[in-house]
Structures are given as structure tokens and as C-alpha cells.
């Protein structure tokens, strides 16, 4: 169902119930937090990294910047400030960059703990194929849902919107699970007690990220549309901020030699760090 049909009851010039006003305040708060986090993330990208290059850096930059048009587009639509194709285009472009950018961030950091070229290649193919299969049809359906023929597009868009959300959530979960598995394997190579706290912390962060995806999907299927889209923007900004906590610890662990019998040498680790 299109945003316009889901929010047709909203009139900023009419008195609203206390519950409705509270809901709109919550939505506005989530969007504001997402914007603040996005600006902070962009600043961190250009002040934290010594070298402006590499897949990890540019994925972080694109994903961070994309939160702004995504949240802005939906704010214009939800509050009927400027319900037009321009607003739809803003949130569609932002959604592409935010979601696929986040997946590319997750994929890029796999290089620090995953050393199988086959796994890295197939996970990258998964991201590319999913982007084509889900972003393109969803974008076409969404523009159609805001056209003069919205009755023809609304049913298909309502279904596909949920399908793509689940698909991208599963994609991020797959990347997080692969990372968690590889991190545990690395943990087994460490001397007993050494760096366990760091790796456990990384696993907890990944669990929190997966939980955020589950909450977003649940809100979508429960029908809380406005809360869902605003919470989605905020959660993606929070997940990207958590990446900075992961980055420092991953580089620290991956650059340190492990058990002397391990076939993965410190030199290999240094090259993995430089590749992200």
C-alpha cells in the first residue's frame, strides 16, 4: 500500500487526538535521530580513516549519506509536506544506498576474519543479485503506487515491500552469521583468555544488529507503517555507528599473531586489514 493511502487521514491543520500527536512526535524523533547520526557518521568517516579509499570506506560513506534522503523523503510523504514524485525519488535513492551500502559494509569487514575467496565471492554475488531482484521492482511499484493509477499498483507494492524487507534482512543476517562463525574460529586460535572479551563483544554487537532487523520486520508486518519507516532509518544509522566499534576491535585482533601452528600468518592478517 502506498504512503499516501496509508496516511490519507493525516491533516496538519486539523486537531488530532493525543495518541495521534504522540505517534507523530515519536516518528519525528526517530527521523531527527537518524539525521543527526547520519551527519555524525559522515564526519567520522573523513576524520577516522587515514586513507580515503577502499570498499569499506566508501560503503560507509554512501550508506551514511543515504540515510538523509531516505528519512527526508518519507518525512515529506508521511506529514504530507510535499507528497510528490520528488519525495518518492528521495526515499527510493536513499533506500538503495542505505540498504545495499550497509550490506557492502558487512561484506567488506568479512575480509578481516574470512579467508575463503569462495565465500567472499558468493556473498558479493548475493548482494548484487538481491539488489537487482528487489530494488528495481520495488522502485517501479512504489512510483506506480504514487501515480494516478495507484489502485493498480497498491496491492502488488504492499506485498513486494514486505518481501524485499525480509529479503534484505535475511541478507544482512547471513553476512552477520558468517562473520560470527569466522570470529569464533579465530577465537579458538587465540591463547586461552586472550582477546576473548573483544571477540565476545563483537558477537554481541552482531546479535544486536540482527535483533534490530527482526524488530523492523515485525513492525512492518504488524502494520505500524509510520513507526516502521522512521525506526528503520534510525536503526540503520545506529548499526552504522556500531560499525566503528567493530572496526577498531577487528583491526586490533586481526593484526595480532595467533597460535604458532596456525596456517594463517601475521603477514596474511596485515594484508587483510589493508584490503578493507
Locate each region found by the language model:
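Extracellular loop 3-seventh transmembrane helix
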Residues: 24-34, 84-99, 138-139, 155-175, ...
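Helix-to-loop junction signature of class
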Residues: 67-81, 133-149, 177-183, 208-227
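A cytosolic-side transmembrane-helix exit/cap motif
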Residues: 106-113, 142-147, 245-257
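Intrinsically disordered, low-complexity terminal tails of fungal membrane proteins
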Residues: 1-2, 251-276
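Membrane-proximal helix-loop-helix units in multi-pass membrane proteins
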Residues: 110, 114, 118-180
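Anionic, Ser/Thr-rich low-complexity intrinsically disordered regions
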Residues: 22, 193-196, 270-271
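Membrane-proximal first intracellular loop
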Residues: 1-122, 126-131
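Juxtamembrane membrane-water interface segments of multi-pass membrane proteins
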Residues: 184-193, 253-254
Amino acid at each position: 500500500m502506498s504512503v499516501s493511502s496509508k496516511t490519507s487521514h493525516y491533516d496538519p491543520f486539523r486537531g488530532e487526538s493525543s495518541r495521534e500527536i504522540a505517534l507523530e512526535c515519536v516518528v519525528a524523533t526517530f527521523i531527527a535521530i537518524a539525521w543527526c547520526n547520519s551527519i555524525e557518521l559522515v564526519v567520522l568517516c573523513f576524520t577516522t580513516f587515514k586513507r580515503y579509499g577502499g570498499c569499506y570506506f566508501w560503503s560507509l560513506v554512501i550508506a551514511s549519506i543515504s540515510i538523509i534522503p531516505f528519512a527526508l523523503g518519507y518525512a515529506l510523504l508521511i506529514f504530507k509536506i510535499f507528497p510528490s514524485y520528488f519525495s518518492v525519488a528521495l526515499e527510493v535513492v536513499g533506500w538503495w544506498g542505505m540498504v545495499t551500502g550497509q550490506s557492502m559494509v558487512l561484506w567488506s569487514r568479512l575480509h578481516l576474519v574470512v579467508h575463503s575467496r569462495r565465500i567472499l565471492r558468493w556473498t558479493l554475488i548475493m548482494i548484487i543479485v538481491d539488489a537487482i531482484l528487489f530494488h528495481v521492482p520495488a522502485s517501479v511499484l512504489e512510483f506506480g503506487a504514487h501515480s494516478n493509477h495507484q489502485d493498480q499498483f497498491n496491492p502488488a507494492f504492499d506485498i513486494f515491500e514486505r518481501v524485499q524487507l525480509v529479503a534484505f534482512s535475511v541478507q544482512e543476517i547471513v553476512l552477520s552469521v558468517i562473520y560470527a562463525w569466522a570470529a569464533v574460529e579465530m577465537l579458538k586460535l587465540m591463547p586461552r583468555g586472550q582477546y576473548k572479551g573483544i571477540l565476545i563483544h563483537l558477537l554481541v554487537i552482531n546479535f544486536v544488529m540482527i535483533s534490530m532487523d527482526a524488530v523492523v520486520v515485525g513492525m512492518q508486518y504488524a502494520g505500524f507503517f509510520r513507526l516502521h519507516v522512521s525506526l528503520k532509518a534510525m536503526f540503520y544509522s545506529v548499526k552504522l555507528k556500531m560499525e566503528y566499534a567493530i572496526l577498531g576491535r577487528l583491526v586490533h585482533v586481526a593484526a595480532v599473531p595467533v597460535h604458532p601452528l596456525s596456517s594463517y600468518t601475521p603477514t596474511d592478517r596485515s594484508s587483510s586489514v589493508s584490503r578493507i
